[in-house]
Amino acid sequence: MAAQLHHALYELLHEAAAAQRALLLAIPFSLLLLPLLLRYLAASASASATKNDGAAPASDPDKLLSLLPSPPMKLPIIGHLHLMGDIPYVSLAALATRYGPDLMLLRLGAVPTVVVSSPRVAEAVLRTYDHVFSSRPRSLVSDIIMYGATDSCFAPYGDHFRKARKLVTVHLLNASKVRSQRPAREEEVRGALDRVRRAAAAREPVDMSELLHSFVNNLVCRAVSGKFSMEEGRNRLFRELTDINAGLLGGFHIQDYFPRLGRIELVRKVACAKTRRVRKRWDDLLDKLIDDHAARMATHQDEDDDKDFIYVLLSLQKEYGLTRDHIKAILIDMFEAGTDTSYMTLEFAMTELIRKPHLMKKLQEEVRRNVPAGQEMVTEDNLPGMTDLKAVIKETLRLHPPVPLLLPHYSLDACEVAGYTIPANTRVVVNAWALGRHSGYWERENEFVPERFLSGDVAGGVDLKPNEFQFLAFGSGRRMCPGVHSASATIEAMLSNLMYRFDWQLPAGMKAEDVDMTEVFGITVSRKEKLLLVPQAA
């Protein structure tokens, strides 16, 4: 977190220089922030003194929060920010073990944040009291990128969220729509396999990170914009912007931790300059696609086309009262969530399997046993009996949840959880990474053991749609990721075919223990190093 803070300050200074503001060029931005922070601290102290004249009422939010378990190493102004580390979900899990195994309070700058680290409390927050914790805290960055948080992921709870959520779950990501995309999935899988086949013939390693990212990105682009997705290199531009979004939405932004700074126009302009430039690029790209679709609809040229997401949104625009900005926000959601979850799960699955060849061999045998002899590739008709395949995917999601810290929740009212009262307007973060490695629920919790999902114990009954809260690959409740059907279909189709068509080895000279498992944190998690594997036709 210290490195992220330094980077954030550097970004602010860089943006100021780009804007050619003489004052900011003359004064280091950190010095500019100091009086603002001191002013903030003085105002907070004054407000606290006024509030504490006489006995504090039982409903006082600060008093209620002070009763929660909390690490003692809180510093002036920054609070517990210095404890977050470069990989926050790992740091938070370690802190929870010492100071709050179920839930704990962190003061992140000026923002009190409750961290949930046990399945029992996760169930209380995401199921029992889901109606209380179903909102989102506001963020300048997500407000800009998502057109005032009018998408379905970052929108605060209310009528617009319910409308956007219904639109996405009923019309875009329902099981029927996912089934209708099967031909596109099979075509994109075939294209990826052809790339691997050529590498195998040349005895060259394959950059699996690039291959899998490209495969999922192309598939999402087709679902969103149909045959327009490949024109003018749009699929590559979508991928570039999606990657930038992930960094921005998961990055450290000082105004999120000191909200009063975010009210200062100068800070808002400088801190969010890059975000506004990225939004402009999204505008240019999405406006062109929407205009193309609208023109075809007006002249009935679309009647024989597959009904991609843009077509569906335009056809429902009046019924749902959607503005153009609403449509663009929902489309960005589809790109962001649809790409990262699937490709990262595929990459982590291949990484874990190459480190345990006996598990890869077992999976290959199952896949090849379930496909008729001579069949070119695995089809979705062959998948139902592949229990090892499903176990590998579940275990990958347990160890490497794509969103290790679920997007923050925000309490709409005061609520008692695990014997503590969480006040209204409190940020709550569920550490999905910690749940998946909770030693009270999992044996050998830090090991890749897919067979745990084949047994008759608790783990064997866990599904991607959570019934037990020790495994939250896609979240839960009103805010559960609606793309579970699409992600499952994409991951199963690709992983099964990689196992069916090829045998895999590490590049010459590498051993399993040489594979770097270092992760990089953003709004989603990724591997630091590319995965290079050598294929051989089976």
Swiss-Prot record:
The keyword Transmembrane helix applies. It is found in: Membrane. The chain crosses the membrane at residues 22-42. The keyword Lipid biosynthesis does not apply. CDD domains: CYP71-like (cd11072). One of its GO terms (molecular function) is heme binding. Heme binds at residue 481. Its main location: membrane. Pathway: Secondary metabolite biosynthesis; 2,4-dihydroxy-1,4-benzoxazin-3-one biosynthesis; 2,4-dihydroxy-1,4-benzoxazin-3-one from indoleglycerol phosphate: step 2/5. Its EC number is 1.14.14.153. Belongs to the cytochrome P450 family. This is indole-2-monooxygenase. It comes from Zea mays.
